[in-house]
Design a protein with these regions (language model features):
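Detector for methionine-enriched segments
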Residues: 1, 191, 276, 371, ...
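Carboxylate/His-rich catalytic cores and anion/metal-binding grooves
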Residues: 372-417
Length: 425
C-alpha cells in the first residue's frame, strides 16, 4: 500500500513539473492572504482547528459558546476518529439478519445488506445496524455566559483563521468587556489549547451530551441527562480528569490550566472553570483511555502546532494565481488553499473520513468508501502522500471482511463496503 501511494505521488509530481526557471512562490504570502476573516455572526462561517484525527469547530468567540445558533448551519463539533457509541441491542440483532438474496442475472443468488420496508426482525436489524455505531460529539467547550445571553450581544468581532500557523485569533466585545482568544489544536494529540485575556473573568464550560443517533445533525441530545454519567476522577489546583460514560462506551477528558482558577460541577454533565485573573490558559485533551502521559502545556501545544503547519505549507506542491488576469483567479486560489487545510484537518486520519469530516455527523458519522477519491486522492497530487498513507492501513485491516463479502456474493477478490464504520460492521 505504501509503495503504491508513493508511486502515484511521484507520477503526479513528474507530470506537474514545469519550467525550472519559474520564480519561487512566496508560500507564506500565498497562504496568509487566503486566511479567512470573520467580522460578524454567520452560522455558515464557523472555523475549525484539527489534525486529521480530531477537530474542534468554534463560533465567533473562538470557543463553542453559542452552539444552538450554529445547529442549522455548520455545527460546532468536537469529533475524533475513535469516538464512537452504540445504543443497546437487547434483542441481539445480528448482521446476518440484514441480508437479502438478489438475482441480477449472473447465474447465482447474491446476498446484500438491505433496508427492509416490511416490519419485523429483519427491519429492526437493518435499522439498528444502520444507526450503530454512530460518531460521538465529545463535548462542548465554550464561555459560560449568563442564561439568556444572545449571540447578537457579541460585537466588534474580528476573527482570523491563521492558516500558516494553524491557529484561530478572536477579538470581540460582550456586555462591554473586551475578549482576546487564541485557539489551537495539538498536531498529534486530540487536544485543544486556548489563551484567553479578559477582565470579565468569564468561566469556561465543559458540557457533555448524549448522542442522538440521528442521520445528520450535531449529535447532541441534551435532554437524556440520566442515560449517561460524567464524573471527576481526579482534581488538583491546576488540573482535573473527567470520565464520560455512555452505556458501554467511556472516554476521558483531561483539563489543565495556568493561572488561578477553580473547577466546579454546575449541573449534570456541566462543569465550569472560573478564572480569578484577567488571563487564563488551558488545555483540554480527549482520550479513549485513562491518561497515562505527562500533560502538554499551552505553550508547547502552540509551538508544536505552529511548527507542524509551517512545515505543512512549506512542503508539497503550491499554486499561486496572483499574476493571473482572469477575474475568477482570486476566488479559485482561495478555494485551492483553503481546501488543502480543510482536508488535512478533516480527512487525513487513520480511517476514511465521513462526508462532513470531523465537524458534524452525516450518515450517523459513518463513511462511504466511494467518496475517498474526493477526500484523499488529492494528497498524492499535492505530494503529501504521508497523509494519504495514514488511511491506507485501514484497508489492509478490513481486507479479510471485504473478501468475505465478495465470497458471500460469489465473486473473486474483495468487495469494499459502501457505508461503514471503523470495525467495518
Amino acid at each position: 500500500m505504501k509503495t503504491f501511494a508513493v508511486s502515484i505521488a511521484a507520477l503526479f509530481i513528474w507530470t506537474a513539473c514545469g519550467d525550472g526557471n519559474q520564480p519561487i512562490i512566496d508560500r507564506e504570502a500565498l497562504v496568509e492572504r487566503n486566511s479567512p476573516v470573520v467580522t460578524a455572526f454567520d452560522s455558515l462561517a464557523s472555523l475549525s482547528v484539527g489534525n486529521g484525527e480530531f477537530a474542534y469547530t468554534v463560533d465567533i468567540t473562538g470557543l463553542q459558546t453559542f452552539p444552538d445558533n450554529y445547529k442549522k448551519g455548520v455545527p460546532l463539533g468536537t469529533q475524533s476518529q475513535w469516538g464512537w457509541h452504540s445504543f443497546a441491542n437487547p434483542d441481539r440483532l445480528t448482521p446476518e439478519e440484514t441480508l437479502k438474496e438478489y438475482d441480477f442475472g449472473r447465474g447465482k443468488k447474491e446476498l446484500y445488506a438491505t433496508q427492509f420496508k416490511e416490519e419485523g426482525r429483519q427491519q429492526d436489524a437493518a435499522n439498528w445496524f444502520r444507526v450503530n455505531p454512530h460518531r460521538l460529539h465529545l463535548g462542548i467547550v465554550g464561555f459560560d455566559v449568563e442564561e439568556g445571553t444572545d449571540i447578537e450581544q457579541v460585537t466588534d468581532v474580528h476573527q482570523k483563521l491563521c492558516l500558516w500557523d494553524g491557529k484561530i485569533e478572536s477579538r470581540f466585545k460582550l456586555n462591554g468587556e473586551d475578549y482576546q482568544v487564541e485557539t489551537v489544536c495539538h498536531p498529534s494529540n486530540d487536544m485543544i489549547a486556548a489563551n484567553i485575556t479578559s477582565k470579565a473573568h468569564t468561566g469556561i464550560c465543559f458540557r457533555f451530551p448524549y448522542p442522538t443517533g440521528a442521520h445528520c445533525d450535531d449529535a447532541c441530545n441534551w435532554e437524556a441527562v440520566d442515560k449517561h454519567t460524567t464524573t471527576i476522577v481526579t482534581q488538583n489546583e491546576s488540573s482535573a480528569v473527567l470520565k464520560h460514560t455512555l452505556d458501554s462506551t467511556e472516554y476521558f477528558v483531561t483539563l489543565c490550566w495556568e493561572g488561578k482558577a477553580t473547577l466546579n460541577e454546575k449541573a449534570k454533565h456541566y462543569f465550569v472553570l472560573t478564572p480569578m485573573d484577567d488571563h487564563l490558559a488551558f488545555t483540554c485533551a480527549f482520550t479513549s483511555t485513562a491518561p497515562s502521559t505527562q500533560p502538554v502545556t499551552v505553550a508547547q501545544t502552540q509551538e508544536e502546532a505552529k511548527n507542524y503547519w509551517n512545515s505543512f505549507w512549506k512542503e508539497g506542491a503550491a499554486v499561486d494565481f496572483s499574476a493571473c488576469t482572469d477575474p475568477r483567479a482570486k476566488e479559485l486560489e482561495r478555494r485551492v488553499v483553503l481546501s488543502q487545510y480543510l482536508l488535512a484537518i478533516q480527512s487525513a486520519g487513520t480511517i476514511p473520513p465521513q462526508e462532513t469530516g470531523l465537524t458534524y455527523n452525516s450518515w450517523f458519522g459513518k463513511f462511504h468508501l466511494e467518496m475517498i477519491w474526493w477526500h484523499e486522492a488529492q494528497f498524492a497530487l499535492w505530494n503529501r502522500s504521508n497523509l494519504l498513507d495514514r488511511t491506507l492501513g485501514w484497508y489492509e485491516k478490513v481486507e479479510p471482511i471485504a473478501r468475505q463479502i465478495a465470497q458471500r456474493q460469489g465473486f473473486d477478490g474483495v468487495r469494499w463496503m459502501k457505508m461503514t464504520d471503523p470495525r467495518s460492521e
